[in-house]
Amino acid sequence: MLRFVVIGITDNPQPFFPPEVLEIIRQGKVFSGGKRHHEIVAPLLPDDTQWIDITVPLDDVFGQYKQLCGKTAEQTTIIVFASGDPLFFGFANTIQRKMPEADIKVYPTFNSLQMLAHRMALPYHDMQIVSLTGRDWQKLDEALIRGESLIGILTDRQKNPHTIHQRMSDYGYTNYQMTIGEHLGNPEQERISSYDEKAVYSHPNCIMLQKTASQVHPLGLPDAAFSLLDGREKMITKMPIRLLTLQALDLPKRHVFWDIGFCTGSVSIEARRLFPHLQIEAFEIRPECEAIIHENARRFGAPGIHVHMGDFRSVCCDSVATNEKPDAVFIGGHGGHLKEIMARVVSVLAPDGVIVMNSVKAPLVTTDSHQLWNEACRELGLTQEPPMRIQLNDNHPITILKCRR
């Protein structure tokens, strides 16, 4: 059985350890950590010890750990050096995930965001923590949309102060003061500074965002504020209908929302603003709509909508749903291919997932989408819920249709 002792360190080239930890190091035979960690602790390691570099792919690293376990019947102890608090987005979490049977003892130090808050004399009990280290933008987007007052960000070399600042500017989040901490804990290299677009920021670094002003968006984004397809006012789901549609989708308890036939993107954008926890996949066949949804998303501060262009019937639904299956789907347009589209949706729809469509009753509309919907639900074994009929001003009546798996 493997035993791990995980010791947190800062970027200080002359680390301080309590006597208990120093004794553990003196008795150690197998050590592990990143190359930077090795440089810092090398003077403290006993002679004739083994060091295992923590590099990607991590499966190779854990393969070496497991080989050590098989060489002796006795318990093997591996002493791992990790940054800051090893249980704070750290390597101790990875050990628990990869080797849940292993025995782990942790000796933490302050993590980088704690140190940055300390340097700024900034209370951080309400800090929203976002890790972008090897991760996508979802959690940062969510924190910005929610208007969190204090956001601490763990960066990597790709998602760095400049790319983060650019993304925030693109979507209108200029209401935050950005402070960057570099090489925290290293007396010679540590630097705390406000964001400067001309600066070169060294790695490792972390970021603190402090909100300087609130942004208020109404419940129901005004239709007139959206860029439209060829200026056609009827090519947008009107705000009251949009809100009723989102209500029918049960989005507060959903995880993955697909918007098929997004056109201006109004439904996706409204959903993103109201329910930023959602993963949103938006589909559209008309190429001119791609620029429109991106323009509207930037205008309304709705980052993180994944856009897919092309005929939905040609989309590989399985590849889009690789990580999570959709549990809420809105069909905003079907081009007369409703049954085929619904069949493709049902092939990847999560258990208890819902599909919603708005059926328009107009004199010049020859295709009865309500009838096609009823037939598709029956053929696909979907359970329909009572429809909701509504008419807005002098527009054509709309029936909000809903079914579930």
Range-by-range predicted roles:
Residues 264-276:
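Conserved SAM-binding loop of SAM-dependent methyltransferases across substrates and taxa
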Residues 342-404:
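C-terminal substrate-binding/active-site "lid" region of AdoMet-derived donor-dependent transferases
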Residues 1-105, 114, 277-280, 284-286, ...:
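Class I S-adenosyl-L-methionine
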Residues 255, 278, 353:
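Glycine-centered, small-residue-biased loops immediately flanking beta-strands
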Residues 12-13, 83-147, 313, 373-391, ...:
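Class I SAM-dependent methyltransferase SAM-binding "motif I" and its flanking Rossmann-like core
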Residues 285-323, 330:
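S-adenosyl-L-methionine
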Residues 2-6, 18-20, 78, 149-234:
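A contiguous loop/helix-start segment that scaffolds small-molecule binding in enzyme catalytic cores
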Residues 254-263:
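Conserved class I S-adenosyl-L-methionine
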